[in-house]
Amino acid sequence: MSLPDKAFPVSWDQFHRDARALAWRLAGLDKEFRAIVCITRGGLVPAAIISRELNIRMIDTVCIATRHDYVNQGDTVLLKGVAPELTTDAGEGVLVVDDLTDTGKTALEVREMLPRAHFACVYAKPKGVPTIDTFVTEVSQDTWIYFPWDMGFTYQEPIAKGSRG
């Protein structure tokens, strides 16, 4: 598989720093979160970091599979919903966490379940920004983010193809 023209590889160190930066932003909101709902699978890692930083012990998952070919995003399939006790008060006091909002399709699906929850993600693309309350880094819509859990160590082509450094 060749990399898209705008590839944005993220290391474990960078992701950890960015997830902590998201936790700092959330802490600055002066909101009391009673639980985290992480959107799997991408939300698992930032939820672990944020739950530690904000001392939130109640964590649930909403499992949504997005069919994609690593270039285009497709339909979503709900595999597991949110625990009923977290949907009381329309999700007031619940923090929904994901790694990325791309088109916003997944966030909108979860927002139907938890309309009063606070939605946060580490990275956001322009189409997804309106669906998220708090994020750290915005990238262009045509950028493909490679998360550390999706990568191994391989040779990277230079940005300027054909240059002789």
Swiss-Prot record:
Annotated Gene Ontology cellular component terms: plasma membrane
Cellular localization per UniProt: Cell inner membrane
Cofactors that this protein relies on: Mg(2+)
Primary enzyme class: transferase
Enzyme Commission number(s) of this protein: 2.4.2.-, 2.4.2.22
Binding site for xanthine: D102, I145
Keyword terms: Cell inner membrane, Cell membrane, Glycosyltransferase, Magnesium, Membrane, Metal-binding, Purine salvage, Transferase
Sample GO molecular function, one term: magnesium ion binding
Assigned protein family: Belongs to the purine/pyrimidine phosphoribosyltransferase family. XGPT subfamily.
Assembly: Homotetramer.
Protein name: Xanthine-guanine phosphoribosyltransferase
Organism per entry: Agrobacterium fabrum (strain C58 / ATCC 33970) (Agrobacterium tumefaciens (strain C58))
Encoding gene (name): gpt
